[in-house]
A protein has these predicted regions:
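Domain-length cofactor-binding catalytic modules of enzymes
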Residues: 2-29, 37-41, 50-56, 65-68, ...
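Short beta-strand-to-turn element immediately C-terminal to the catalytic PLP-Schiff-base lysine
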Residues: 59-61, 82-83, 312-313
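Compact, glycine/acidic-enriched structural inserts
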Residues: 78-117
Length: 397
């Protein structure tokens, strides 16, 4: 579908979704954001839903300001995927061992590595920039520096919620590895620290929503936030890269006879800020549950733990600030899903997938999400599909 504009907003709110299908709370969030004087436009993706801090599935383009609560607490959260030389014919009948080996190699939930992962010992891992990245830890906010040991041991770990590690097949029978994670606890603590600072600034008093608090360019607070933000985004990228390297090691060992080969990795953030230029103006673009989809750029749009996901290539639609959805998008809250569904429903909806089917992941049941096929149909002018993949193993935290 092409976009529709939300009427009555102070700046263009272009929506790649049916406005009637969007919760009132999410619509109010969007209207509130549009009132900020630094806003130059909003693009709303088809996976849109109400979110903490800002609407999930929104792209917020601002000149000279950024809203830290809109980025959220999982700075740099995103996806990585890689196609392998393995095919369905290489797979064993029982995939439970593979799932167990993945869970042994990559800590999930609140878990962390007993010792810091040495990237130099990971097959093919590009270590250039690694030492420089960690040297910049000395320059981040003093309030979180005591977390350095935890940050190093959580590097290469999954987390919980909708984060996952999946072993997938595409329609041609090729095996893909895919995972979803972010900046772990260090990103959360940095985000909360800066959100608190923003909400105490004089120019942010009296806002209709305290989550609209912004940092303004050329101020010490903005400089500090952007320094920590970009470091956390890099942490998230490294976190996924190390997880993927550990995942590949498992696959090499489990499929030793097949001698798997891995293609170039695709990686994309979907909770982050980027400096981009539109209509001759330098903007700070916040993608809150959205991926960049510039012309020819690869991206990953996952479904849920029982549905398909998509590898895509961007079409470079500037009306959407070169963006696309980050997934299917929730259609009910986690608590609502737990009240409505049972573990029997979860078993039914994840049939054929080697995964957890207990009450601890009931809030991730596929029916709690919008139909991914509908979401993809609504953004045909934002991305083209490169591959449709479906998980056969799913690891959750």
């Amino acid at each position: 579908m092409s976009y529709v504009e939300v009427p009555g907003a102070k700046v263009p709110i272009r929506m790649w979704a049916d406005p009637a299908s969007v919760e009132d709370g999410a619509m109010q969030q969007l209207r509130n954001v549009s009132t900020l004087p630094w806003i130059k436009g909003l693009a709303v993706m088809p996976d849109v839903h109400y979110g903490k801090g800002a609407t999930v599935g929104s792209v917020i383009a601002m000149h000279g300001a950024v809203c830290p609560a809109a980025v959220g607490v999982d700075i740099g959260c995103g996806m990585s995927a890689v196609r392998t030389s393995l095919t369905a014919n290489d797979l064993p009948g029982d995939l439970s061992r593979l799932r167990s080996k993945i869970e042994q190699a990559i800590p999930v939930g609140r878990g962390m590595h007993g010792d810091t992962v040495d990237p130099g010992k990971l097959h093919g891992f590009p270590t250039s920039g690694w030492d420089d990245f960690w040297s910049r830890f000395d320059g981040i906010a003093e309030a979180v520096k005591f977390r350095q040991e935890r940050a190093t041991k959580q590097m290469g770990t999954l987390g919980s919620g909708n984060h996952m590690i999946e072993f997938c097949l595409d329609e041609a029978g090729a095996v893909w590895l895919m995972l979803h994670s972010g900046s772990r606890n260090i990103g959360k603590e940095l985000a909360e620290h800066h959100i608190g600072i923003a909400q105490r600034l004089a120019h942010n008093q009296g806002l209709v929503d305290r989550d609209l608090a912004v940092f303004i360019s050329e101020t010490p607070q903005m400089t500090g936030y952007r320094n920590d933000l970009y470091w956390a985004q890099e942490y998230a990228k490294y976190n996924r890269a190390i997880m993927m390297a550990l995942f590949k090691e498992v696959v090499r060992k489990e499929f030793k006879k097949a001698r798997p080969v891995f293609e170039r990795e695709i990686s994309c953030h979907h909770n982050y800020v980027a400096e981009e230029r539109y209509e001759g103006m330098d903007l700070l673009v916040t993608r809150k549950g959205a991926i960049r989809a510039g012309s020819g750029e690869y991206g990953i749009i996952p479904g849920s733990m029982g549905t398909s996901s998509y590898i895509v290539k961007g079409l470079g639609n500037e009306k959407a600030f070169n963006s696309a959805s980050h997934g299917a998008g929730r259609r009910m809250s986690r608590n609502a899903a737990k009240r409505r569904f049972t573990t029997r429903d979860l078993e039914e909806q994840t049939r054929g997938v080697e995964c957890r089917k207990d009450s601890g992941v009931l809030d991730e049941i596929p029916a709690a999400y919008k139909p991914i096929e509908q979401v993809m149909e609504q953004q045909r002018d934002l991305v083209e599909v490169v591959a449709k993949i479906k998980q056969i193993v799913c690891v959750k935290g």
